[in-house]
Design a protein with these regions (language model features):
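A glycine-anchored, Pro-Gly-centered beta-turn/N-cap motif
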Residues: 4-6
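Generic short beta-strand segments
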Residues: 9-18
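Basic/aromatic-rich interaction segments and small domains that mediate binding to polyanionic partners
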Residues: 19-52
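Intrinsically disordered, low-complexity, charged/polar segments
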Residues: 48-67
Length: 67
């Protein structure tokens, strides 16, 4: 299923910060806001972009809840 454009709360699937860092998700751990637009997922904290990836990767590696 393709992730639709919108704003989500993204939660890392990793159980701890070390696992998140090993997978390159430390800037998102434990959660961050995620804006999906035109197949790009942009993660931010306090209005500052911290990471980005394609929407398919985000859907596979994070728990995303529409907000």
């Amino acid at each position: 299923m393709k992730l639709r454009d919108g704003i989500y709360m993204a939660r890392c699937k990793e159980k701890n910060a070390l696992s998140a860092a090993a997978n390159g998700h430390s800037l998102v751990y434990p959660q961050a806001r995620c804006t999906v637009k035109r197949d790009m997922a942009i993660f931010d904290r306090d209005g500052k972009e911290v990471w980005r990836c394609n929407a398919g990767y985000a859907e596979l590696h994070f728990v995303l809840e529409k907000i």
